[in-house]
């Protein structure tokens, strides 16, 4: 029987653990911000934050037409590494948003499909993204690097098309009942078919187009380091993230009921089919945009929800917040490490590959500690 002292001790350990993670988050953020792009050396934190403060003041002056904007060129010239610091800061925000979005998507999928191995790419989303990039590169070749709008249109459109196809095929296979198992099987089959198509087309692509496709698949939009492009990309991702995350947060109490069979969820007053459809649409938009920015990061969506349950418990609102925080932290760590690893002929180490190498052993340790299965 748990005593009051045991309860208070557990609460204290929990709070200390969360405080430790918060401190780790700040340290990793400062370290990643101070890494000089391409130089594998650090600038001083004082210089980095001074540049960010100057950038914020200049943006406010530009927006409200203040006299400070007339000194913009002179102030920037006297601030070492100004544009590099601002671009690095924007990339870090993009990285955190992508990590949070992909981890939250994995947590939602595992509840919606009542499957501890479910991931947001299982219903054809990843296949749609690859097909969209393939069509874009086949049409525009090297120009695809700078086409943010078309890239979103192609990949989001095909990702949603694959999702609709999977849901329709699952409904047909389940005899007008949307079977979760049938949807997962259909998604797996479509993924194999589209993967074969992508492989065949890649074999017949010119070397230049193949390099563009592989770069966009592994590095995403971060391959474009243009100052203005990075700013527009950040605003677009932030709008998509908030537009999808706010409804999911509002529906967080429904997910606890969705962890039960559909018949039981209906007795609780929910419409499981409607909840699942709305969530799949929101998660598809959020995860697709994140993959377009940071490349394929499949392991993160599988590992982070399990780590979150281990640290914060199995209540979905705790899992949701924990997944959001831990996903941002882990992907930011991967971003910092990848900036220090330069591969001749390839550039910096792909963040998606590094995320898989980091998350896999962490997930194995967490699952070994739990030993009692998935709640």
PLM features per residue range, with description:
Residues 2-375:
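Alpha-helical transmembrane segments in inner-membrane proteins
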